[in-house]
């Protein structure tokens, strides 16, 4: 049986969690939280990182930072994403404006996003998909030209680069996920990167339940008080300790995943006239090899191959169900054909297994089998 995902483990997690028991501080914002934040800051070359209990929480902090209560505000984002991307802003009262995807990348199309900017637009959320980038530098130029903010949903992109810049550090804000389905994880955790300095203090207040606690701890304020509408957004020290062990194993994790990804890529790239898409390796981007996917010629072919792979005890999954045609999206006034490309291509994409317990040869076998099944479908 080839599972779609198996959570990564380093064998150091239990030791670090045992150390939390020795230190006797469990609730969060302690030794291991700071250690994780320092590691992330050094790894991606930024100053301002807040460890969160999820990527969803990181997005929710951004939404609270940008919300002008009482004003009509819009946020542009792709429909092809996880629900949290939209829900974080919808909960804060933003009007959600869904944009089309580029079918070749399955990421937000810059021309369509540009066409939807209005005087009420506060920002654009780009979602980096599968360990590949959504051309953040071009979106940064677009946002700068229109005096709006760029938010990177980099849930799947920790360790990825666009040129020499880490994804998640190019916009005003970057949001990472350390959910157990990601390359590195704490079961459930995340991080917020604040690249726009004017939001650093407020972000810290929101992260600290809306209080100035961090300023009091640093001796910058003498009274502990409520200064902002915030929430409970940081993880426990148990989660942070688990994540610390994972982060320290970044290089090993990266090299293993690259080898497995290469097994898929070598087979698909070596076959011609396939009639479907798969991830493109580009000199402009460096991947973290989070996922390998195939976009087939039609939904029927995709379903046929997914079900046939099950017969070989191989678990493969479809991508996201588009948000604009979901129950909530329909309630917002959207119809499925409002974003025809998103609706069409979301039914044609299949993610193949990729986790550190696989081998390069296993990926090659699955790739060869996928091509064989595609030919079988077309006969």
How would you name each of these model-derived features?
Residues 1-26, 225-227, 353:
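N-terminal "arm"/small-domain region of PLP-dependent enzymes with the aminotransferase-like
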Residues 29-74, 88-90, 98-100, 165:
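Phosphate-binding glycine-rich loop
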Residues 34-39, 43-50, 111, 123-127, ...:
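PLP-dependent aminotransferase class I/II
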Residues 62-115, 123:
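Conserved PLP-anchoring active-site segment centered on the Schiff-base-forming lysine
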Residues 87-89, 142, 238:
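Hydrophobic/aromatic ligand-binding patch that stacks against planar heteroaromatic rings
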Residues 92, 145-146, 312, 377:
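Helix C-cap/helix->beta junction micro-motif
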Residues 104-186, 191-198, 351:
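Active-site phosphate-binding strand-loop segment of PLP-dependent enzymes
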